[in-house]
From Swiss-Prot:
Entry binding sites for substrate: 21, 133, 352
NCBIfam families per record: bioF (TIGR00858)
PROSITE patterns (UniProt xref): AA_TRANSFER_CLASS_2
GO biological process, one term: biotin biosynthetic process
CDD domains named in the record: KBL_like (cd06454)
PANTHER family according to UniProt: 8-AMINO-7-OXONONANOATE SYNTHASE (PTHR13693:SF100), CLASS II AMINOTRANSFERASE/8-AMINO-7-OXONONANOATE SYNTHASE (PTHR13693)
Cofactor: pyridoxal 5'-phosphate
Organism: Salmonella choleraesuis (strain SC-B67)
Keyword NADP: no
This protein's name: 8-amino-7-oxononanoate synthase
Organism phylogeny: Bacteria, Pseudomonadati, Pseudomonadota, Gammaproteobacteria, Enterobacterales
Amino acid sequence: MSWQQRVDDALTARRATDTLRRRYVVSQGAGRWLVANGRQYLNFSSNDYLGLSQHPQIIRAWQQAATRFGVGSGGSGHISGYSVAHRALEEELAQWLGYPRALLFISGFAANQAVITALMKKNDRIVADRLSHASLLEAANLSPAQLRRFIHNDTQHLSRLLQSPCVGQQLVVTEGVYSMDGDSAPLAEIQHIARRHHAWLLVDDAHGIGVTGDEGRGTCWQRGVKPELLVVTFGKGFGVSGAAVLCSESVADYLLQFARHLVYSTSMPPAQAQALSASLAVIRSDEGRERREKLAALVQRFRAGVNASRFTLLNAHSAIQPLIVGDNSRALRLAEALRQQGCWATAIRPPTVPVGTARLRLTLTQAHEACDIDRLLEVLHGAGE
């Protein structure tokens, strides 16, 4: 088989099963409205849960820092790319979340890959929830450690897997809020089981940080859990981009030596770090609390209004509200029907989600109004099959 045939066959297979992904060019993709091809849509696909990507205080912080530092960091943090803005943000994050150290990464994907590849050795075992993010599972598959996956949120299965003999160390991997199902992990029980088996716990709280818990401290804080490794990302609740790993002093020092994604990547721009500090200040303020309360009310309004006889709504109380459709082509048709009625929603299909669970991944944000939720429900019930 030639290179070209390999490429063509893979694309043909995706087209045949209605799983071919595509990108859409938008003029505005975050916030209440999405603008594409000159048309405005109510936006139910954005991860900008608190509406902070458009916050004037955060935009101004980025602009002012860009004037001071320039638009790039100029290098890896190990060379010349670790500025006072980066250090200040790391210290603020560590203090906020109650950890000795925080390390910044350019993305959540990079942070997850870096931690797993740096820590895991040949005789180790990773025990991950089977619905963990692709960045976690890919890193686990590529690492020399053994990967075992437990049934989603099934702590008994997790316990059985941890009980089997392991010569090396064990790492339990889960998420705070799951990106495709919108539900939360039973973190307290997972941590208890991990500690009983002398395993470390890694929690990716990309979709919980900023949005849940006291001062937006996330799912772990809300559940009274402190994992050895906490990954938080800044492209959702923070409204910006990037990520951080919260950990102990010694683990931070270890990652600075052995996390290749950190050592060999250009640091995020200092202006971005400054904007993230401004975003954190909003999240921790009374305004941040009010934004979280508004979002929670919108989620409750949506869930109360969905016709359960026509749609399968998962047990999710986060900003992520998936409607399970099942069939790939039906999910695509439903997404298109919503767009025709002015609501932008995304059909999620395998391999992102398991076969037979194609869905509309609806995301609600603080930028929405109650009338937007009512319009979404009206369109959904009119388009349902």
